Amino acid sequence: MTMRSLLRTPFLCGLLWAFCAPGARAEEPAASFSQPGSMGLDKNTVHDQEHIMEHLEGVINKPEAEMSPQELQLHYFKMHDYDGNNLLDGLELSTAITHVHKEEGSEQAPLMSEDELINIIDGVLRDDDKNNDGYIDYAEFAKSLQ
């Protein structure tokens, strides 16, 4: 597995956090997170519902138990859309990727190089930006999670 896909995986896993919601886990078998060819997705790299709710504290007043996986998915998207244009641009993707990378690594984790980060963002845009506008909109984001 290349360094690009190893670093891209945590970002995509962070995007898959909705599937770690307790209700979703009952419907989706845990084995689906580590099947061969699934880019190494596993429970250790996926952001959980509790982590998302920490970031949404004070923003969302609905209890997490009442939120559907789709609502959590939308809120995750919105919490990385810093300029509020309903699109994720390269900078917003970069911030999300480095956030995931920092939280998964130890304090001594090596910093991601600028070239590695650029390659990951380029890969995300190449694979998931279906209309080639340079942004990931919510429909593209949701489709990438299927």
Curated annotation (Swiss-Prot):
Question: Per the record, what about its domains?
Answer: Essentially unstructured in the absence of calcium ions. Requires calcium ions for folding.
What UniProt keywords are attached to this protein's entry?
Calcium, Disease variant, Endoplasmic reticulum, ER-Golgi transport, Golgi apparatus, Metal-binding, Phosphoprotein, Protein transport, Repeat, Signal, Transport
Q: Where can this protein be found?
A: Endoplasmic reticulum-Golgi intermediate compartment; Endoplasmic reticulum; Golgi apparatus
Q: EF-hand domain spans which residues?
A: 68-103, 116-146
Q: List the disulfide bonds.
A: none
This chain belongs to which protein, by name?
A: Multiple coagulation factor deficiency protein 2
Q: Which organism is it from?
A: Homo sapiens (Human)
Q: Which GO terms describe its biological process?
A: protein transport; vesicle-mediated transport
Q: What is the effect of changing D129E?
A: In F5F8D2; interferes with protein folding
Where do the annotations place Ca(2+) 1 binding? Answer: D81, D83, N85, E92
- GO CC aspect terms: endoplasmic reticulum membrane; endoplasmic reticulum-Golgi intermediate compartment membrane; ER to Golgi transport vesicle membrane; Golgi apparatus
Does the record bear Lyase in its keywords? Answer: no
Pfam families, alphabetized: EF-hand_7
